[in-house]
Amino acid sequence: MAIAMIPKTMSTQHPDNAKMPAWASEKSMIRNDDEVEEAYQCYTIGIKEVMWDAEGKDVDTHVLRKLISKNHEFFEKNVLGSDIFLTYRVPNPAIEGTERKVLTETLESIPVNYDVFNTVYKRDIPPIFEVILPFTTSSKDLLNIAKYYEKAVAARDEIELYDNVMVKNILGETKPKKINIIPLIEDKDSMFNIDGIVKNFARAVSAKKMRVFIARSDPAMNYGMIPAVLMSKYAASRLCKMNDDIENYPIVGVGSSTFRGRFSPENIEKSLYEYSNYYTFTLQSAFKYDYPQDSVKNSINIINRHERSFDYLEDYEEEIIKNAVNKYVINYQKIIEKLAPAINNITMYLPKRRSRKLHIGLFGYSRSTGNVTLPRAISFVGAMYSMGLPPEIIGISSLLNMKDDELDIIEKTYINLRSDIMESSSYLNYEVFDALKDVYKIDQETINMIKADVKYIENNYGIKSDLGYERERHNYLSSLMNLAFKNHDFENTRKYILDMALIRKFIG
């Protein structure tokens, strides 16, 4: 179906917040029903779209009914599907096992929500008409969902039950007849093939406009921060080039930590400049809850006024980026595979901010390296920072192996590279090298590779020595956390991890 007004701000349920919102029913965790209140609160502070995670367990497909019961008058003035939006993130049946039929439940709820909304507000507007499909790797992934909805949900109206009695005579007409599918592209190969995915799907469904979602967090965990930024720039460039044929509105999935995008109220102008080719930006939990509300609201207004640029890379520059990414990934993944057991152990003691199980990531499917399973990106980042080893550092000495033209393109394309490296490396605790060996039993070869990364930063960017009280305290707490973990003092392990997260203003 046609795309309505395109929102520029998208709230997500990513549990990266260190602080808890005042409206939460519990001190440490957002419960299922709290998420309905969360969605309502997001709309009231100017966020135009809420992504509702229908991928995990305990999904609530009655969210719209609960939402409008919060404040009937608000949703009379702010029309869902026209002024503000609710967008499902659905399971990808090509990857999911036991949860794949949650897709059916979620898609079936779309016409139900239409009926509820139309009954209450007397408007012929579908309040939900788009879904996000994670792990999209081909146009067929998208076509499967689009056609399933059209033929298994909407087209059953015309099924004759008996003697000219149709399904629509019993259940009423199904609306909307079609839905828009937003591909969420998360892996390297698919990002480098974004043209084929988008063009082939648009051709198959005769779409003139599309929203395309580019992941930023999982690519960073799977390939490294610098490759993740470069891949997001590559994807945005390709989308800019095809805009004359298929009008597109890219979404970038950014978080507050530098590793996951450094998209926070205190860095909003730099972030919008870095990702200027994107139209819509995700506002994750740390963005919303770890900063003063005036700052959050002001940042939301800035994003809502942001104009997308259409600058793009030359074809030869895109090829250089692909080569640079492939070079960088080699050392990065070698190190991460060795650190995986330590990371997985520490994540057990991170604060849990959501009660229901949300979506899982590429490493959870072991689709990226094939050798290790890692937690979600938020937990991954939280574990690394808690050890005193910012993940932004890992693999950066690979730049020594780059050709001059590759380095030039990296520095030109990743605008805030120096700023981001200096920010994240200020959380490096040099005592982590002893902890890696003594506490986490990491082999010396891997430790030496990490030391080479640190040396590269020292030589090329510098690491702040005058850190200030909070950064010094963070370093001290990371040493205490490693000591507590070594001695199986898991109560204090949890305490130190939370204290550090509060300093950073994000868990991971």
Curated annotation (Swiss-Prot):
It catalyses: oxaloacetate + phosphate = phosphoenolpyruvate + hydrogencarbonate. It holds the Pfam family PEPcase_2. Keywords: Carbon dioxide fixation, Lyase, Magnesium. GO terms for molecular function: magnesium ion binding; phosphoenolpyruvate carboxylase activity. Its cofactor is Mg(2+). GO terms for biological process: carbon fixation; oxaloacetate metabolic process; tricarboxylic acid cycle. Its EC number is 4.1.1.31. Homotetramer. HAMAP family: PEPcase_type2 (MF_01904). NCBIfam families: PEPCase_arch. Belongs to the PEPCase type 2 family. Catalyzes the irreversible beta-carboxylation of phosphoenolpyruvate (PEP) to form oxaloacetate (OAA), a four-carbon dicarboxylic acid source for the tricarboxylic acid cycle. This is Phosphoenolpyruvate carboxylase. The lineage of its organism: Archaea, Methanobacteriati, Thermoplasmatota, Thermoplasmata, Thermoplasmatales.
